[in-house]
């Protein structure tokens, strides 16, 4: 099964820091391409108004993270993205949402996203899986991924199921039908990138937040495992919704 995957780039960070690293779309491709060398990936710059022509143009979609807020209707590209998510859902086409993408799916389909009263989730963070799915192989009851967010889903869309979370982020992952899967976290982020990000944010966030973030990096991120789950999700979704 050779699939064409659209990676929808929503990160609008144009800082000098961001320029030192591959963009978030490229990070997703670097994670998934080695796992499925015969698949093709195309990064589409949603932040510049580029979206697939219709929900069937690709075999699957990944929405990246972004420092933007899904609640910021002043941004001209947020509304069209939410409309596209609704179209993908109506067409039952496979979609994975990461961080901002997770939140965008929630808002597009009737859920709610708010600032986290506990502040920033930064560094590494766990997801304790309450439910497992066929694509989650090898199975693991708790996964750790990089986190960088101060907003999160507070109410899921009708019909969504929470697959896992934590005390800090109760709705850490959602499933909708057999075609949408989301996570609040960042499988595409490496330890090197997070260490650099913490350095960049050192004078922008409070000392307690930064200390917790640095300490959390003692917990290794399950990047290879989660990448495997992602490609297996697409394969499962294409089989279930051909």
Predicted regions and their residues:
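Short, glycine/charged-enriched secondary-structure capping and boundary segments
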Residues: 20-23, 56-58, 75-78, 110-113, ...
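N-terminal beta1-alpha1 cap of cysteine-dependent amidohydrolase-like domains
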Residues: 1-83, 87-91, 211-242
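C-terminal and late-domain segments of enzyme folds
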Residues: 161-163, 169-242
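Short glycine-/acidic-enriched loop or helix-start segments at secondary-structure transitions
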Residues: 17-18, 53, 72-73, 106-108, ...
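Cysteine-nucleophile active-site neighborhood
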Residues: 66-131
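Hydrophobic/aromatic beta-strand patches that form the interior of the parallel beta-sheet core
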Residues: 6-8, 42-44, 62, 96, ...
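Pocket-forming structural segment of enzyme catalytic cores
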Residues: 109-192
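Flexible, glycine-rich phosphate/dinucleotide-binding loops
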Residues: 14, 50, 70, 104, ...
